[in-house]
From Swiss-Prot:
Keyword Transferase: yes
Swiss-Prot/TrEMBL keywords: Hydrolase, Multifunctional enzyme, Purine biosynthesis, Transferase
CDD domains: IMPCH (cd01421)
Occurrences of domain MGS-like (ranges): 1-149
Descriptive protein name: Bifunctional purine biosynthesis protein PurH
Pfam family, one: MGS
GO (cellular component) term, any one: cytosol
Alphabetized GO MF terms: IMP cyclohydrolase activity; phosphoribosylaminoimidazolecarboxamide formyltransferase activity
Gene behind this protein: purH
Length: 525
């Protein structure tokens, strides 16, 4: 069958960008246009010849527009196989005219339910019924019908029609049909996820089934190691789309590697803990913080963070919670860093930093989503959990020792607790005056983590006397706490919950330590 000439088009869109110009060109090629509701009004007000869909159906739009295109004269006109004699005869006998083009995009359901104040009733009213039905009918019969779901395809279709005497090519129709089923499957999944969450009142990590769509956003040279293939995919699990370009803009440097992406995720997750607080700087290496600090100025925060470990930051990732100023940029420029991340860059800073071509500069466009579902693939299935977004407040703390923490110790305890959540377990973090002074990460023994943190502090020439220490999980024995006391710590924050808590508390009292329990663990694997 030859490519069918487009003579009649049905146009009904929620996104009206470019639709007037598109329909005006269709009309100039002799295409008869039918439309509904707001689209019809916009076309007519713009001087584009268009008729109501009711002229086809002989039936008015009813029930606040819920029923307008669900009619045999619409779907018969879309689904009729044009070289099937029986279909043609049945269409003729029932007064059904063929429809050669459908231009439809759907009610903005995902955007509606993403609004924090949306009501259930508003969400339901934004479930499109007629739109998906017309799209699917048109896509199924793509041998005869051209179907368009987004304005980005208007120009391609118009150009083809002009080149082919009013027809589109089969390859284009097939491609556009594929877009339909991608769109409707995502749309239906979003609705299903929303209704499931509304009826169950549960996080999606507790749902019986989860649909996740991954679409490649970035090609990567290789994965964690050069012999591994890799890519970065934007993700939509029904709770909202997540993509690199949505949150970041690369201003300078080479493409990010697989490991760069992991470190960027770690750096931004940690700096988010200090979003609305005093100037803060985070230095990350292999997804672990090797230095974190707050101060009255950004440059002071950077110098304090760097002094925690003056070797590991080379080739690391630095993130800050303030626009990057020239003084701080010059201090950072003294060493090689893979990536700098900032919410803004002050005048002249980019020009100076861009002199090093291998350094990547990222602009963080907006805060990261807080309540998201996390996925971790194994070779035998997928783990799903809520993100560890909770952080203990001062009101959550329970002092379990004879000595109460001082105001300064309490500040440092809260600072250390925020950081230990982002360090690989087992975790011990020493803090003094809003600065990490020792970080022990990823050891099988909590005592070993405490020893490593103390050793790193000694290498950096930092004094642990009077410091506060955080442990991501309880001390199973008193030995871990005693190691911290021996290092000079005077205040401890930990979840508590060990069967030997009494022994640990007694050891703290014996060394005049102030200790608080959070009743919240922060394992990170």
């Amino acid at each position: 069958m030859s490519d069918p000439v487009i003579k009649r088009a049905l146009v009904s869109v929620s996104d009206k960008s470019g639709v007037v110009e598109f329909c005006r060109e269709l009309s100039s090629m002799g295409v008869e246009i039918f439309s509904t509701g707001g689209t019809l009004r916009k076309l007519q007000e713009s001087g584009v010849a268009a008729a109501s869909i009711s002229t086809i159906t002989g039936f008015p739009e009813i029930m606040d527009g819920r029923v307008k295109t669900l009619h045999p004269k619409i779907h018969g006109g879309l689904l009729a196989v044009r070289d099937n004699a029986d279909h043609i005869a049945q269409a003729r006998d029932n007064g059904i005219g063929f429809i050669d083009m459908v231009v439809v995009n759907l009610y903005p359901f995902q955007e509606t339910v993403a609004k924090p104040d949306v009501t259930f009733e508003e969400a339901i009213e934004n479930i499109d019924i007629g739109g998906p039905s017309m799209l699917r009918s048109a896509a199924k019969n793509h041998e005869s019908v051209t179907v368009i779901t987004e304005s980005a395809d208007y120009r391609t279709v118009l150009d083809e029609m002009r080149e082919n005497n009013g027809a589109t090519t089969r390859s284009t129709r097939l491609k556009l049909a594929g877009k339909v089923f991608t769109l409707t499957s995502r749309y239906d999944r979003a609705i299903a996820d929303y209704l499931a969450a509304s009826s169950e009142g549960e996080a999606s990590s507790e749902a019986g089934s989860i649909s996740v769509r991954l679409e490649k956003e970035i090609d990567m040279r290789y994965g964690e190691n050069p012999h591994q293939n890799a890519g970065f995919y934007r993700m939509d699990d029904g709770s909202g789309s997540r993509s690199f370009e949505e949150y970041f803009r690369k201003l300078h440097g080479k493409d990010l590697s697989y490991n760069n992406m992991l470190d960027t995720a770690a750096a931004t997750a940690l700096i988010e803990e200090f979003r609305d607080e005093a100037p803060a700087v985070v230095i990350i290496k292999h997804t672990n913080p090797c230095g974190v600090a707050q101060a009255d100025t950004l440059v002071e925060a950077y110098r304090k963070a760097f002094s925690t470990d003056t070797q590991s930051p080379f080739g690391g990732i630095i993130a800050c919670n303030r626009p990057l100023d020239m003084e701080t940029a010059k201090a950072i420029d003294e060493i090689f860093t893979e990536i700098l991340i900032a919410p803004a860059y002050e005048e002249g800073v980019l020009d100076m930093l861009m002199k090093k071509k291998n350094r990547r500069l990222l602009l963080q466009r907006k805060p990261l989503l807080q309540e998201v579902t996390e996925y971790k693939s194994t070779r035998f299935g997928m783990l799903v959990q809520e993100r560890d977004s909770r952080i203990a407040s001062r009101d959550d703390l329970k002092v379990v020792t004879k000595r109460q923490p001082s105001a300064q110790e309490l500040d440092d305890l809260m600072f250390a607790w925020k950081i230990c959540k982002h360090v690989k377990s087992n975790t011990i973090v020493y803090v003094k005056n809003r600065q990490t002074v020792g970080v022990g990460a990823g050891q099988m023994s909590r005592v070993d983590s405490a020893k490593i943190a103390r050793s790193k502090a000694a290498e950096a020439g930092l004094d642990l006397n009077g410091s506060a220490v955080a442990s991501d999980a309880f001390f199973p024995f008193a030995d871990g706490l005693l190691a911290a006391a021996e290092a000079g710590a005077m205040a401890v924050i930990q979840p508590g919950g060990s069967v030997r808590d009494d022994e640990v508390i007694a050891a703290a009292d014996e060394h005049d330590l102030a200790m608080v329990f959070t009743s919240m663990r922060h394992f990170k694997h």
